[in-house]
């Protein structure tokens, strides 16, 4: 071994001494850190075990309480359903008792035409009607037609309130239903998903036919009382008029219509027994009875009390009639055929006697689908709102003075 090699070995040995000392200190440091981590991990495990035990204890305490709360909730729900059923039953019983024993009306009524049990006064019959407004117009022609859309079934009603907001639309689908659709404006009704824009108003008793009317914030409609048409009993072939407050959603008045032996007034619309109408003069009812099963009858109603003020036997036949409406105290009856063809006003009756049959126009309706299930006149717009085999249609009317010649 040469002197250079010995020198190199001595240098390497001098370097290895400090490196071994540093490695020893590093190992001791790592061992201390690992011991600290193990201690903290043990503490975390102890805390987790303690928290898990506390959660189990809390769960064991809460489960019985939740079971008790669920049982109490079910008991309250059952009790609420029972109370609701009792309230509904009481309301029906009170409503029936009111129709059977109404308060005496504060009007003078001819004893010969006094209503029977549950009815209000029948009023004067076949006397000339005294107009309360200066309305003196009659139809000259049905000028135009606009089909809005198709909504609902073949029979129904859509209308506006002639005394309410000018834009609001009311839709009553079907002949035996209890839910009306209310649209804020006509544009909402014409949308593809119109039902989503509508609010729903549910009435306490289903209506009969398509003779409903919205007037002055109220929904007027006919319902079958116990023993009404098709139900047997002493009220066979009678109907009850309901006055329903649309905002409060309550029945504010009701009365059995003072006519016995009611039959459908329109030969082509068998589901409607009383067809309510509104014009410049107020509230009217079109109906028919077995006493004269060939012609229509007209009644003037008090919208506040549902009293029948006057009644008339009209010369308008029931056969092939499909709908009717009133303008300025004059009844206009629309006739058609089966299968449906082009409808036409073929009979009119002026309760005031101003418009004679010779001066009355008998216009045709524009060509359209199916047959009219309902027609509603809006005196503010001078338009007809028609339900035609599921289509909602607006007819614009051209007017003239009653005294003018055709």
From Swiss-Prot:
Domain called Olfactomedin-like: residue spans: 134-401
UniProt entry tagged with the keyword Secreted: yes
Keyword Signal carried by entry: yes
Domain of life: Eukaryota
GO biological process: signal transduction
Endpoints of the signal sequence: 1-21
Pfam families: OLF
Compartment annotation: Secreted
UniProt entry keywords in alphabetical sequence: Coiled coil, Developmental protein, Disulfide bond, Glycoprotein, Secreted, Signal
Disulfide bridges in this chain: 135-328
Residues that carry a glycan: 248
Annotated SMART domains: OLF
Coiled-coil positions: 22-101
Chief location category: secreted
Gene Ontology CC, one term: extracellular space
InterPro entries associated with the record: Olfac-like_dom, Olfactomedin-like_domain
UniProt family annotation: Belongs to the OLFML3 family.
PANTHER family referenced in this protein's UniProt entry, alphabetically: OLFACTOMEDIN-LIKE PROTEIN 3 (PTHR23192:SF8), OLFACTOMEDIN-RELATED (PTHR23192)
Function: Secreted scaffold protein that plays an essential role in dorsoventral patterning during early development. Stabilizes axial formation by restricting chordin (CHRD) activity on the dorsal side. Acts by facilitating the association between the tolloid proteases and their substrate chordin (CHRD), leading to enhance chordin (CHRD) degradation. May have matrix-related function involved in placental and embryonic development, or play a similar role in other physiological processes.
The protein's name in its UniProt record: Olfactomedin-like protein 3
Source organism of this protein record: Bos taurus (Bovine)
Organismal lineage: Eukaryota, Metazoa, Chordata, Craniata, Vertebrata
């Amino acid at each position: 071994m040469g002197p250079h090699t010995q020198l190199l070995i001595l240098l390497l040995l001098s370097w290895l001494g400090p490196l071994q000392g540093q490695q020893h200190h590093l190992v001791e440091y790592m061992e201390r850190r690992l011991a600290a981590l193990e201690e903290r991990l043990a503490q975390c495990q102890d805390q987790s075990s303690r928290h898990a035990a506390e959660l189990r204890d809390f769960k064991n305490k809460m489960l019985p309480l939740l079971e008790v709360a669920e049982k109490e909730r079910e008991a309250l729900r059952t009790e609420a359903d029972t109370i609701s059923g009792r309230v509904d039953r009481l309301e029906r019983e009170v409503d029936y008792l009111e129709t059977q024993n109404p308060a005496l009306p504060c009007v003078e009524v001819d004893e010969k035409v006094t209503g029977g049990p549950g009815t209000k006064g029948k009023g004067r019959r076949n006397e000339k009607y005294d107009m309360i407004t200066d309305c003196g117009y009659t139809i000259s022609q049905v000028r135009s037609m606009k089909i809005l859309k198709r909504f609902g079934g073949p029979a129904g009603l859509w209308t506006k309130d002639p005394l309410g907001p000018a834009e609001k639309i009311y839709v009553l689908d079907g002949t035996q239903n209890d839910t009306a659709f209310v649209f804020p404006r006509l544009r909402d009704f014409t949308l593809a998903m119109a039902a989503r824009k509508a609010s729903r108003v549910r009435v306490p008793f289903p209506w009969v036919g398509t003779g409903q009317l919205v007037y002055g914030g109220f929904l007027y409609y006919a319902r079958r009382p116990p023993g009404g048409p098709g139900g047997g009993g002493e009220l066979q072939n009678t109907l009850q008029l309901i006055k329903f407050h649309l905002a409060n959603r309550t029945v504010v008045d009701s009365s059995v219509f003072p006519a016995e032996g009611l039959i459908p007034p329109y030969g082509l619309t068998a589901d409607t027994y009383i067809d309510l109408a509104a014009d410049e003069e107020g509230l009217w009812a079109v109906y028919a009875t077995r006493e004269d099963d060939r012609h229509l009858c007209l009644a003037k109603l008090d919208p506040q009390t549902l009293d029948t003020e006057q009644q008339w036997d009209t010369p308008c036949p029931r056969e092939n009639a499909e709908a009717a409406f009133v303008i300025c105290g004059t009844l206009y009856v629309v006739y058609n055929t089966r299968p449906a063809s082009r409808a036409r006003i073929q009979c009119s009756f002026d309760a005031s006697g101003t418009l004679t049959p010779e001066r009355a126009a008998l216009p045709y309706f524009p060509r359209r689908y199916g047959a009219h299930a309902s027609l509603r006149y809006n005196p503010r717009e001078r338009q007809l709102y028609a339900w035609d085999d599921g289509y909602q249609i607006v007819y614009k009317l051209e007017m003239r003075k009653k005294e003018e010649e055709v």
